[in-house]
């Protein structure tokens, strides 16, 4: 009876570990290839606009500090 309980506990812990690691991997892949990360990359292309001056960039940095 003790070995069955230990085996059941071991399987539950193993199941929890695999589901947590799968969620971590999917979350990491979602951050890399997800819609939100692509949108954030699109906003960065405006920093290379030649019409922006150094003062404009400094103002943008101040605005985006707490965003």
UniProtKB/Swiss-Prot annotation:
GO biological process, one term: defense response to bacterium
Tissue expression from the record: Expressed by the venom gland.
Compartment(s): Secreted; Target cell membrane
Residues forming coiled coils: none
Keywords of the record: Amidation, Antibiotic, Antimicrobial, Cleavage on pair of basic residues, Membrane, Secreted, Signal, Target cell membrane, Target membrane, Transmembrane
Phenylalanine amide modifications at: 33
GO annotations of cellular component type: extracellular region; membrane; other organism cell membrane
Signal peptide per UniProt: 1-23
Propeptide boundaries: 37-67
Tree of life domain: Eukaryota
Cystine pairs: none
Major localisation: secreted
Family from the record: Belongs to the non-disulfide-bridged peptide (NDBP) superfamily. Short antimicrobial peptide (group 4) family.
Reported function: Amphipathic peptide that has antibacterial activities.
Entry protein name: Amphipathic peptide Tx348
Organism, scientific name: Buthus israelis (Israeli scorpion)
Lineage: Eukaryota, Metazoa, Ecdysozoa, Arthropoda, Chelicerata
